[in-house]
C-alpha cells in the first residue's frame, strides 16, 4: 500500500513538473545581467513575477552580452534542441542598430529566427527595440519600423521596449546611458511578466 501511494505521488509530482511551461529568453546585454550578478537580472526574477500572475514558468536565459541578430540566429537551433521551449522571447537588434547594420539584414535575421521557432512548435514574442536618436532620424525610424512590420507579416506578438520606460528614471540607468542598473531589474521583470501573461 505504501509503495502504491509512493508511486501515485511520484506520478503526480512528475505531471506537475511537466505542467510548467518553458520560456527561452534570447537576448543581448539588456537581458544577460550586464555588470551585475546573474541572479539579479530580470530573467532570473521573472519566474517569481509570473507566479504572482498565476503562471508557473521555467525561464531559460539564453542571452549573451554583445549579441547581434546574426549571433542569435547562429545560436538558436542548439538552444531550441537543448531546451525545447514552449515560448521564445526575442530581445535582439540593439547591437545591430548601434553598429549601423542595414535594416534588411536585421529583418532577415529576425525573420529566420521566427521561422525556426515556429518550426520547433514554440510560440514567439518579439520585443520592440529602439536605437538612440543620435543615429539620425532616417535610420532610427527605419530601424524602429522593422519590428511592427515583421510582427504583422509573421503573425507574432510584439512586446513594448522596456527600456523606453526605464530610461526616464536616470537613477535606474548605468553611466553609459544604455544599460539598466540592478535597481531597475525588479520593475523590468514585472513589466515583462504583465506582457507575457497575455500569451501564456
Swiss-Prot record:
Which InterPro entries has this protein been placed in? Ester_Hydrolysis_Enzymes, Lipase_GDSL_AS, SGNH_hydro, SGNH_hydro_sf
Keyword Cytoplasm among record annotations: no
The alphabetized UniProt keywords are: Hydrolase, Signal
Q: Which residue positions does the secretion signal occupy?
A: 1-19
| Assigned EC number | 3.1.1.2
User: Active site located where?
Assistant: 29 (nucleophile), 176, 179
Family indicated by similarity:
Belongs to the 'GDSL' lipolytic enzyme family.
Q: How does it assemble?
A: Homodimer.
What's the protein called, per UniProt? Arylesterase
Amino acid at each position: 500500500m505504501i509503495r502504491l501511494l509512493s508511486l501515485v505521488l511520484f506520478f503526480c509530482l512528475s505531471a506537475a513538473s511537466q505542467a510548467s511551461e518553458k520560456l527561452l529568453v534570447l537576448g543581448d546585454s539588456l537581458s544577460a545581467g550586464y555588470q551585475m550578478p546573474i541572479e539579479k537580472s530580470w530573467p532570473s526574477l521573472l519566474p517569481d513575477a509570473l507566479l504572482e500572475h498565476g503562471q508557473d514558468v521555467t525561464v531559460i536565459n539564453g542571452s549573451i552580452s554583445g549579441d547581434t541578430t546574426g549571433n542569435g540566429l547562429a545560436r538558436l537551433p542548439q538552444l531550441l534542441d537543448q531546451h525545447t521551449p514552449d515560448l521564445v522571447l526575442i530581445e535582439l537588434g540593439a547591437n545591430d542598430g548601434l553598429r549601423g547594420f542595414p535594416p534588411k539584414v536585421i529583418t532577415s535575421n529576425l525573420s529566420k529566427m521566427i521561422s525556426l521557432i515556429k518550426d520547433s512548435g514554440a510560440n514567439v514574442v518579439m520585443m520592440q527595440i529602439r536605437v538612440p536618436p543620435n543615429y539620425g532620424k532616417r535610420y532610427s525610424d527605419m530601424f524602429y519600423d522593422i519590428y511592427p512590420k515583421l510582427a504583422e507579416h509573421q503573425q507574432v506578438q510584439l512586446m513594448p521596449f522596456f527600456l523606453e520606460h526605464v530610461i526616464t528614471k536616470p537613477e535606474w540607468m548605468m553611466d553609459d546611458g544604455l544599460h539598466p542598473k540592478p535597481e531597475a531589474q525588479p520593475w523590468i521583470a514585472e513589466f515583462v511578466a504583465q506582457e507575457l501573461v497575455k500569451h501564456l
